[in-house]
């Protein structure tokens, strides 16, 4: 470890100790923010998802015997991811050499900052909804950011929810390898309202649905293309 990296880790450890011992706070974000200002070279393979999904994946990976690095507290912006990496630094030094896997939750708009640095093996895209328009703006902007993030990490495999046309449209426009998942059939909890995506991303024709599970998620097709 070079002097710059050592200084970053030491500063992060001091910040974490101060937040936990003096201010009685978890300190997941500030240590990462401090470390990033000093050393931006902390990179580890990871998989992105929301809090519940990332924790489930982390538990499954840990059950396989691998060592897992995960931002379980939900600090899902760039400083929080770096903080999780630094938190794991001392643990990794004392574990036997073997398979080590990073599983990180990431804020949608921070994917463009996190993916190019982590270069994760997989990127999991669960769904996209208009529930945070005050912060994210139009859903089109969020799609653009995620697509650009994947373009900046071309070796990353996209795992996406094919029941969501907003996710499927991202998969169709990026060069990354992709794996689709979804629900095969109705769940008897269908909705009669489509909330976010009514038009084909390729030709802009109105999408037709066999059924809608929730929001825009369901079995859909484009009658034109």
Question: What residue spans do the PLM features occupy?
Answer:
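Phosphate-binding loop of NTP-binding sites
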Residues: 3-182, 189-202
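Cys/His-rich short segments
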Residues: 184-225
